[in-house]
Amino acid sequence: MIDNSQTPKISFCITCKNRLYQIKKTLPQNLEDNRRLQEIVEFVLVDFGSTDGLRKWISDNFKHEIRSGYLKYFYTEEMVYWHASIAKNTAHMLAQNDILVNLDCDNYTGSNGGW
């Protein structure tokens, strides 16, 4: 059992644009692998105007995770051209936890956030 009072909290920050084919594989697995730690883990997914159905897929499949705060989903069309630093900084601003970890859409965290 993890003592959550002393454990730093972690935010996995994912930035995405038109990578539904990748996030469909990784996000459900990452959420499941870390579900028992959701008091200290959050996932932040920032969608920069995807046109491949990502927004609908998230809405259809992750209502519970979004309501609970385990998954934060943010959609914006403000970034016309992809810029990795802007994307990551946007996700970091939305994250609430002590440790911020950048994930690409095709990255897996492993069980327990890799701890």
Feature map (PLM): residue ranges:
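Short alpha-helix within the catalytic core of nucleotide-sugar-dependent glycosyltransferases
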Residues: L27-P28, R55, N97, S111-W115
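Short beta-strand/loop segment that forms part of the nucleotide-sugar
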Residues: E39-G49, F74-E77
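A conserved hydrophobic helix/loop-capping motif in glycosyltransferases and polysaccharide synthases
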Residues: I10-Q22, T26, D33, V46
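Short, aromatic/basic amphipathic alpha-helical patches
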Residues: K56-H64
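Short aromatic/hydrophobic "clamp" motif used to bind/position activated sugar donors
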Residues: L100
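Glycine-rich, basic loop-to-helix element that forms the pyrophosphate-binding segment
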Residues: E78-A95
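Short, acidic, metal-binding catalytic loop of nucleotide-sugar glycosyltransferases
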Residues: P28-I40
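A conserved acidic beta->alpha catalytic loop
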Residues: D47-W57, D104-N107
